[in-house]
C-alpha cells in the first residue's frame, strides 16, 4: 500500500496559511475587476449592470465575464449568474472535469435556469447536483424550481419570454420548455434523485432530453470528514448518468461555497491519479508511482478560484476537503 499523499498530512495551521494566500490572490483580482482596468482578465462585465440585479441572488457574487455562461437566446439579455468551470491539473488529472457552477435559482430566474440546462448541455442525460437545502436557518437558500411529483407538481413550463428585471430586461428563448416529472427515488439516506424530461414545445428546436436531478441537502457539518462517504457515492452515481460531453451542473445557494467544495472533491475523487486509485483501485494505479510534489488540493482550488470568485468560500470548507481526503485514504488503508 502506497503512503498517503504528503499534502493530506499537513497541519491545519499550514493549510490555513495556504487559504489566506488564495484569498489574498483573489482580493487582488477583485480590486482589478472594479478599478476600471481595461481588458482585465477579471472583468465582471455585464454581471454588474443594473438591469441584471434581478438575475443575481446575491449582490456580491458575480461570474467573470470571460467564462460566464451565455444563454441561448433569439433576442435580448443573455445573462445568467453561472460560470463554465474546467479543472485540469497537469500530472494528476486523468481527464479534465467540466462543470457549470451556478447560483440556486430564484423565483425570478428558475425559467432561465432550465433553458440553460437544455441549451448549454448539448447531449441527452443532463446531471444537476444541488448541494443546498431549500431553506436553512429559516432563510430561503434556493427556490424549489423542479417538479417533485406531488399533487399538482408534475409539469412546469419555462416561458420563451422572460423579464426578471422588468420591461427593460427582456429575453426571448427559442421555445417554451416543458419540464416534466418522471420518477423519484432516494439513495439510502444520502440524497434524492429525480428524473425529469425537458421538451421544447416547438419540436424544431431540438429533441427531448432527460435530466437527473441530485438533491443533497444533508451536508451541514464541515467538521465531520466522514460526510465525504455519501459525496463519494453521489459523485460516482452522477458521473454514471451524465452524458460525456455535457458539463455537470452544480449549484448551492450562491454557487460558490458548497458548489466549489463539491467540485473540488468530485474532481479529486473521480479524475485524479492519487485518488482514483483509492476510490476505484483503477487500472491507472501504475501511473501514480511517483509522488506528486505539489499540493493537489491547493492546485484544484486555485483553478476554481481563477474561474469563479469565492469557490470553496470558507476556511472550514477548505479544511474539509483535506480532512475528507485523509479519511478516504484511511478507508483504503483499512480495507
Swiss-Prot record:
Signal peptide: none
PROSITE patterns membership: TYR_PHOSPHATASE_1, TYR_PHOSPHATASE_2, TYR_PHOSPHATASE_PTP
Post-translational modification (record): Activated by phosphorylation at Ser-83.
EC number(s) on file: 3.1.3.48
Any Pfam family: Y_phosphatase
Alphabetized UniProt keyword annotations: Cytoplasm, Hydrolase, Phosphoprotein, Protein phosphatase
Localization: Cytoplasm
Catalytic activities: O-phospho-L-tyrosyl-[protein] + H2O = L-tyrosyl-[protein] + phosphate
SMART domains (alphabetical): PTPc, PTPc_motif
GO-annotated molecular function: protein tyrosine phosphatase activity
One GO cellular component term: cytoplasm
Annotated GO biological process: invasive growth in response to glucose limitation; pseudohyphal growth; signal transduction
Coiled coil: none
Active-site residues per Swiss-Prot or TrEMBL entry: 252 (phosphocysteine intermediate)
Gene3D superfamilies, A to Z: Protein tyrosine phosphatase superfamily
InterPro entries on file: Prot-tyrosine_phosphatase-like (IPR029021), Protein-Tyr_Phosphatase (IPR050348), Ptp1 (IPR016277), PTP_cat (IPR000242), Tyr_Pase_AS (IPR016130), Tyr_Pase_cat (IPR003595), Tyr_Pase_dom (IPR000387)
Domain Tyrosine-protein phosphatase: 15-328
Domain of life (superkingdom): Eukaryota
Record function comment: Is not required for vegetative growth.
Family indicated by similarity: Belongs to the protein-tyrosine phosphatase family. Non-receptor class subfamily.
PANTHER family noted in UniProt: RECEPTOR-TYPE TYROSINE-PROTEIN PHOSPHATASE, TYROSINE-PROTEIN PHOSPHATASE 1
Name of the protein: Tyrosine-protein phosphatase 1
Organism whose genome encodes this protein: Saccharomyces cerevisiae (strain ATCC 204508 / S288c) (Baker's yeast)
Native organism taxonomy: Eukaryota, Fungi, Dikarya, Ascomycota, Saccharomycotina
Gene of this entry: PTP1
Amino acid at each position: 500500500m502506497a503512503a498517503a499523499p504528503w499534502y493530506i498530512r499537513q497541519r491545519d495551521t499550514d493549510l490555513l496559511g495556504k487559504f489566506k494566500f488564495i484569498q489574498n490572490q483573489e482580493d487582488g483580482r477583485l480590486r482589478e475587476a472594479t478599478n476600471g482596468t481595461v481588458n482585465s482578465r477579471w472583468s465582471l462585465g455585464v454581471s454588474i449592470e443594473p438591469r441584471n440585479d434581478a438575475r443575481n441572488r446575491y449582490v456580491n457574487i458575480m461570474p467573470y465575464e470571460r467564462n460566464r455562461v451565455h444563454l441561448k437566446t433569439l433576442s435580448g439579455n443573455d445573462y445568467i449568474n453561472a460560470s463554465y468551470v474546467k479543472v485540469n491539473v497537469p500530472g494528476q488529472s486523468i481527464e479534465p472535469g467540466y462543470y457549470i457552477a451556478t447560483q440556486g435559482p430564484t423565483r425570478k430566474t428558475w425559467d432561465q435556469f432550465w433553458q440553460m440546462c437544455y441549451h448549454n448541455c448539448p447531449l441527452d442525460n443532463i446531471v444537476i447536483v444541488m448541494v443546498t437545502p431549500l431553506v436553512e436557518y429559516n432563510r430561503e437558500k434556493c427556490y424549489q424550481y423542479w417538479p417533485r411529483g406531488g399533487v399538482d407538481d408534475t409539469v412546469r413550463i419555462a416561458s420563451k419570454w422572460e423579464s426578471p428585471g422588468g420591461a427593460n430586461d427582456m429575453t426571448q428563448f427559442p421555445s417554451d420548455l416543458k419540464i416534466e416529472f418522471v420518477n423519484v427515488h432516494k439513495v439510502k439516506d444520502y440524497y434524492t434523485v429525480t428524473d425529469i424530461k425537458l421538451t421544447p414545445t416547438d419540436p424544431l428546436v431540438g429533441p427531448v432530453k432527460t435530466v437527473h436531478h441530485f438533491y443533497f441537502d444533508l451536508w451541514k457539518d464541515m467538521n465531520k470528514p466522514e460526510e465525504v462517504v455519501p459525496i463519494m457515492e453521489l459523485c460516482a452515481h452522477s458521473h454514471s448518468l451524465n452524458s460525456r460531453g455535457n458539463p455537470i451542473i452544480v449549484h448551492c445557494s450562491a454557487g460558490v461555497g458548497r458548489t466549489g467544495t463539491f467540485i473540488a472533491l468530485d474532481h479529486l475523487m473521480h479524475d485524479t491519479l492519487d485518488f482514483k486509485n483509492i476510490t476505484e483501485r483503477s487500472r491507472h494505479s501504475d501511473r501514480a508511482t511517483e509522488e506528486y510534489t505539489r499540493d493537489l488540493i491547493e492546485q484544484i482550488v486555485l483553478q476554481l478560484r481563477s474561474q469563479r470568485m469565492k469557490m470553496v468560500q470558507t476556511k472550514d470548507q477548505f479544511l474539509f476537503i483535506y480532512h475528507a481526503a485523509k479519511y478516504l485514504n484511511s478507508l483504503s488503508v483499512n480495507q
